[in-house]
Amino acid sequence: GGEIFGKVVEKGRHGKLYTLTIRDYGVFVVTKDVYEKVKVGDEVML
């Protein structure tokens, strides 16, 4: 972890799969904990 740093532009949930779309990097699958903690517009490090 730690190599991806950017702004969350979208959140998605597909069944039990949780995703965050990070500007300039694309879509990442994350845990439910991360998904619920992060808001659109937040800067995150993955």
Q: Would you name each region that the model predicts?
A:
Residues D33-L46:
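Short nucleic-acid-contacting surface segments enriched for D/E, G, S/T with interspersed K/R
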Residues G1-H14:
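Structural detector for short beta-strands of small beta-barrel domains
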Residues F5, T31-K32:
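Generic hydrophobic-segment detector
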Residues R13, V27, Y35-K37:
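Generic "edge-of-domain/loop-turn" microfeature
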Residues V8, L20-I22, G41-V44:
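Hydrophobic beta-strand residues in large extracellular and virion-surface proteins
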Residues R13-T21:
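Short aromatic-glycine-enriched beta-strand elements
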Residues I22-V30:
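Short, structured beta-strand/loop micro-motifs enriched in basic residues and often containing a Trp
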